[in-house]
Amino acid sequence: MDGILLTLVVLVLGISLAVVTSASGQSPVRISGHLVNMGLALVLMVLIANVPPHLLSKVGPPLYATGVILLVGVALFGEIRNGARRWLDLGFIAFQPSELLKLALPLMLAWYFQRNEAVLRAKHFMVGGILLLVPFLLILRQPDLGTALMLGASGFYLLFFAGLPWKVILGGATLGAASLPVVWGLMHDYQQRRVLMLLDPASDPLGAGYHIIQSTIAIGSGGLFGKGWMQGTQNQLDFIPERTTDFIYAVFGEEFGYAGAILLVCLYLAIVARGLVIAARAPTLFGRLMAATLSLNLFTYVFVNMGMVSGILPVVGVPLPLMSYGGTALVTLLLGMGILMSVATHRQLNKS
């Protein structure tokens, strides 16, 4: 078990519990639910941390196949919530299969590239691109642009660390920039409105601009040291939307100020740095790819959420890692932390 990483994770979870308590109005249901989610996620993290990476790598293909099948099931039989078909209801449980792909995709790609490590060619990167594209398009169809983009970033990180040539990266970036007008035309109306709201959220203060306006007021009013725990007026008067989930950073910023925000960012950066150290020390390609990708995934989620809440990025429904209320996202994230700890703990292993 990596003590440094574990300590950092527990510190952020402790802050999360305090902020969820405030954001929920001290709701016993929310607080107890968050404690249960944290307890379950931590137990699973410890269990995964004790599984050798070469065994974890074998989970990649079946987990990926299961995830893709479930995404197809969502497209055919999924439950529509808030205008999007993202949920699969099995009767005894309803869940979003896209969460499964956040781990299944990097596991699959890392397994594939380690398996072909000695003979890596352009065709292997093409196969990797296809493995990324299948779940990306299925999630984009739901539509869930935020999750699709995060999954795309995760796949790109892994391909990059596996040795994707720079000429391919630059060519892809040029093609992507040239196709922006086409992408804009394919976006749904509500997605276009979210982007346009960045320019002038005050043009629709009670509609599409409401989230950005209220969250930026909360963060700005927190000042240097904040208004104090459970003393945030924007929070307590119910102005901040989704304040226990996607916009929990606005609650934190209002109550703990810029000083608290800097501390939280430093904790996140420390987790990312520790993950990259683990990646550099990993003895196998699988371990290096997983550790580096999971670390940058965390950084991306934090950057996008904080940027979204601060009004510098569109609202895309991305939770703040380790902070936002929500069982599935927290379990998925701590399973990833468990994989990081597994790579750190089991340095002497056989290549699968």
Task: Name the predicted role of every residue range.
Residues 223-259, 282, 286:
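Long extracytoplasmic/lumenal interhelical loops at the membrane interface
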Residues 144-149, 227-232, 243-245, 262, ...:
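Transmembrane helix boundary and interhelical junction motifs in multipass membrane proteins
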Residues 5-211, 250-310, 335-339:
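Hydrophobic alpha-helical transmembrane segments of multi-pass inner membrane proteins, especially
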Residues 91-101, 141-143, 223-228, 315-332:
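Glycine/serine-rich anion-binding loops at beta->alpha junctions
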Residues 304-352:
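A juxtamembrane structural motif centered on a specific transmembrane helix
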